[in-house]
Amino acid sequence: MKKKNIKNSMNNHTPMIKQYLSLKSQYPDMLLFYQMGDFYELFYEDAERISELLKITLTKKGYSNHKIIPMAGVPCHKSEYYLSKLVKLGESIAICDQQKETDCKKKLISRKVVRIITPGTVTDEVLLEENEDNFIAAIWKENNQFGYSVLDLSLGFFGVSKIFSSCDLLSEIERTNPKEILYPENFSDVFLIESRKCIRKRSLLEFDLETSYKLLNLQYNTCSLDGFGIEKNNFVIRAAGCLLQYVKSMNMTLLPNIRQLKYNYMEDSIFMNFSTRKSLEITQNISGEKKNTLSAILNKTVTSMGSRMLNRWLNSPLKNFKIVRNRHESVEALQFFYKELQFILRQVNDLERIYSRLALRTASPHDFVRMRSTLEILPNLHLILKKIKSKHIKKIRLSIGYFEEVLCLLKKAISLKPSKCIRDGGVIAELYNIELDELRSIKINSKEYIKNFEQKEKKKLMIESFKIKFNKIIGYYIQISKRHTHLIPKYYVIIQTLKNTERYSVPLLKEYEEKVLNSEMRSLLLEKKLYAEIFNIIEPFLEKLQNSALALSELDVLVNLSERAISLNYTRPIMSEKYGISLLESRHPVVECFLKTPFIKNSVFLSRTQRMIIITGPNMGGKSTYMRQIALIVIMAGIGSFVPARYALIGSIDKIFTRIGSADDLSNGYSTFMMEMMEISNILHNATSNSLVLIDELGRGTSTNEGLSLAWSCSRYLININKSMTLLSTHFVELTKLEEKEKFVKNFHFSAIKSDLHIAFLYKIKNGISKKSYGISVASLSGLPDSVLEDAEKKLIEIENT
């Protein structure tokens, strides 16, 4: 609720509403879940908003200050379900729980905010997407450069980058896909992020350099940031400091799970801008969905940790051939073992996120059960990994470890089927603590004691309707039919009269009740104490657990890539430091999986003497698919995957640029032509001789002569200035004359067979130029009226004969 909506005069409000408004004023930009018994209730604008977002009933909570109070609520026991929906919608929530009664007359219950949930700071399993990272980011801009920091609290990951342009920043935001973004109040490039769900303007004080420097050193117990490579990098220090401060305040605690700070050197991976990622459909298709993407085909990992890691790899293919070759060697070595390894890895739980909750001390009893079951399978995993002759797999195996001490503790300390929450008890296993077992035995034996007492009194008083019952309000009580009340002894104290029965209490029963309830309370307190001690015992192992989780993730990815290589008939690529790309009988990794007929394979050869390939041919003839498959194969090779080709040699690639029109987003008001020119300008300014450039139909959207002129001049610039490896498709036949004027250009085409107004595509690339574009024949496939097509044919003949 905004401040203007908080009433100026508090005197006309009920005590409860006064309390609510006071708490709400502390969290004006969040939905306040205000506990009222078994419900969380929301009032005023919060009620209206949650009603609209979740489609729940909007009602009223009487009147206050002479006005109706809009109200909506959700049951406490179902709150996680609603919170999950709100977080996905980009909402932040403050959870306000009841504490105790502070005013005996008015019975106003004390309440306080015990938990803050924002999209970028959640760690609860039910609020997280299983196969996605959950980053929160902060941006600082200075001198047209940016400091960019990301943190995933659920994994304990903290990273920073220095970014040199707004275009690169947009690319990095697309790559990391943060659920929440912090930016300073003077940020001039808000347009870059305003379309995202959860962006937060922060005070410049939160980006203060000195404060940020101190916060980072305090987090890592250091006196300098030299060890992280950012000592004099003020941009990233400001961004990281703001982010760390914000996450701490939202989490209401220290962040012991944040043990490292990774400096992301942009030059370590192949650069792909926003347009490239979108048009290649790596992890999201054009519609923003996950189906029919490279990830959908490659990602058959069996753990959520592995799934997240593979998507990270796909978004950051490496230029470091040593790491890539290690991965290729591992994928090859795993080919005889992937089935049995995947069988075991399916039993591995999300140790990466469990580690983080352990460090934050928010791990649930079920987290301990999942960790126990994961640690139990490690010996069998080691037995298989020891058979594999690979230095990299051996390194992974050693990082996985065994954790016998932790496993022994969890077997002894945690019940086989504990309750969901420690406050419900039943978490600590029997025989772990003698005192706890004794306290529990009182509760267990109470049923027998009550049964014996009931039978004894029933027999003594000869009352057939005599029963002993229990409820939370009055505790144990004796219930007797009214027709037998004349048989009741004087020491029976009546406590409740109902229609047909009366309820009584006796001193002996009350004393026993106190003993049982006291034992339950002591048992729960002891169980909580023992539970906290388990965290203390495990704490020294946390760093190794985190390393083990990362190693298990990588193993899952490599085993998955090995399975994909065999199942999809992929080939190990040769990675070369030399210039060029050579692919024989290559296939599109996504398209081939959805065809009912065999995919038509095509080759490509790019070298210093053949830097540009100009492709002509009909629409739908295979030009765009061909270009995309080359880029996707480069990406696959760069993450350590085998590739869909009979032979593949991949040279050193530093950047991939695409300009393919189907990825256009015209919502910002630019025309398709303007979008094309802006993207081409970006390519010409940033592509190098080691860049792969894919351009589809350059020069559309303006007159034929102007379009051809621009396509001609841009192509010559790419050939002679950028010297990039370029594939360019076109319908301008005149553009193919570049082959005669530039020695680095080669013409290729896709052909088709036409009969009457119908067309059959061959999808095979060949040397030379396509003599026709077959536009009218392709148009016939869209269902245009025959008369329109016939008229078009006549006009075409007329134009060609002019």
Curated annotation (Swiss-Prot):
GO terms for molecular function: ATP binding; ATP-dependent DNA damage sensor activity; damaged DNA binding; mismatched DNA binding. ATP binds at G617, P618, N619, M620, G621, G622, K623, S624. InterPro entries: DNA_mismatch_repair_MutS (IPR005748), DNA_mismatch_repair_MutS-lik_N (IPR007695), DNA_mismatch_repair_MutS/MSH (IPR017261), DNA_mismatch_repair_MutS_C (IPR000432), DNA_mismatch_repair_MutS_clamp (IPR007861), DNA_mismatch_repair_MutS_core (IPR007696), DNA_mismatch_repair_MutS_N (IPR016151), DNA_mismatch_repair_MutS_sf (IPR036187). Disulfide bonds: none annotated. One of its GO terms (biological process) is mismatch repair. GO terms for cellular component: cytosol. SMART domains: MUTSac, MUTSd. Gene3D superfamilies: 1.10.1420.10, DNA repair protein MutS, domain I, MutS, connector domain, P-loop containing nucleotide triphosphate hydrolases. Keywords: ATP-binding, DNA damage, DNA repair, DNA-binding, Nucleotide-binding. This protein is involved in the repair of mismatches in DNA. It is possible that it carries out the mismatch recognition step. This protein has a weak ATPase activity. Belongs to the DNA mismatch repair MutS family. This is DNA mismatch repair protein MutS. It comes from Buchnera aphidicola subsp. Acyrthosiphon pisum (strain APS). The gene is mutS.
